[in-house]
Every structure is written in structure tokens, then in C-alpha cells.
Amino acid sequence: IYSILNKDQINKLEQTKDLDCSYELPGVSRYRVNVCYQRGRIRTTIRTIPTEIKSFQDLGMEGGVFEKICQIPKGLILVTGATGSGKSTTLAAMIDYVNRNRPNHIVTIEDPIEFVHPDKNCMVTQREIGADTPTFASALKHVLRQDPDIVLIGEMRDRETVQVGLELSETGHLTFATLHASDAIQTINRVIDIFPPGQQSQIRTQLGFVLEAVVCQQLLK
């Protein structure tokens, strides 16, 4: 596995014993890679990332609901579901729709970058945790200096990331983000519960002002 990792990735793996990254074989495909240790040895999981971004029609998301969501000028849009439920695929379709239909600057912050979005009607800046910025929170602290209209937060993992995501939505930006939650009610509770009790009333008010949509999906087998 070391043959496909760069020096920084190898250092991170040896220090933390865990690594998430992406890898590309030009002309073949892109891959999401997880490397960890088990029983003192390296274990690797590699998943193929589709090179083609599906449209809403391709994904069976008809009826115009997702198109309307992507036309919202500002606020917070949460895409939630269990691991492997297709959140990344849905978000990629949403970002691609915006990219084709709005003249904006999109900044994505991902760990790792999965779907690559070339500039279409939008300018797209894609930043990867580890390669381009140390953490989600660090990237979000500086994102306003990059003059975005739309921000994609690959995952709201901690309190600081959630807080900055809410603040971005309050300042007139359209913010997309993912969470692990099984339904819309749990999604809202998870956002609130990540904060201490003394701050939760303020977060409820803040969330009430900025939350525009919750998309919760399940993969049917």
C-alpha cells in the first residue's frame, strides 16, 4: 500500500495508525482508500468511486424536489443516512446540478475528495483534509476569505465544525453538509446534542433560522 501513498500520508498513517485518502489511476478510475492496523499489521479497504456523476433522473430522484432544494439561495441543507447509504452520490448530484445551473463559486471540504467537479457554470474549489488543509474546522475558519457562495462540508464531525457551518449559513451562504443519522428528527437532535446543555437553546434558535432541508436516505437491499 505504501507504493500509492505520498510521504505525508505515510507519516500520518505511522503516527495515527489510521488514514483516509483517495487514489486515482488515470484513465481507469478513482478510489477511496482506508488504511488501518489490526493485530499489528496493515489492513486496507479500497472502494471504487464512480467517475460519472449521476443526474437526479439517473438516481430516480424525480418530481423536481431536489432541483428546488438546489435553487435555495442560502441556508443549511443536511444530507443524512447510515454509512454506505449513498450520501456522497446524492451530494455529488446536487453539487453538479448547482454547477450547471448557477453562476457561483463552490468550495468543497472533503475527507477525502471523492467525486471531481470540473468548472461548468460555477467555479469549483475542492479541498481535501490532509492534503490541502489539516481539519474541517481549520478549513472552515478560512473559507470566507476564499469568497464562496456555496460551501460543501463533507462531514459535520465535531462541535466546532457544526458551529462554523451554522454561522456560514447565517451569513448568506448556501451550505451543504452530511451527518450520520437515521431520520430527520434524529438529524436535528444530533446537531443540538453535540453542544453543552447551556448552549442548546441558542443552537435551536440558530438552527431554526438557517435549516432549509434535511434529506435522509436509506439504501434498500
Annotate each PLM feature:
Residues 1-221:
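Short, flexible helix-loop junctions that flank or precede catalytic/ligand sites
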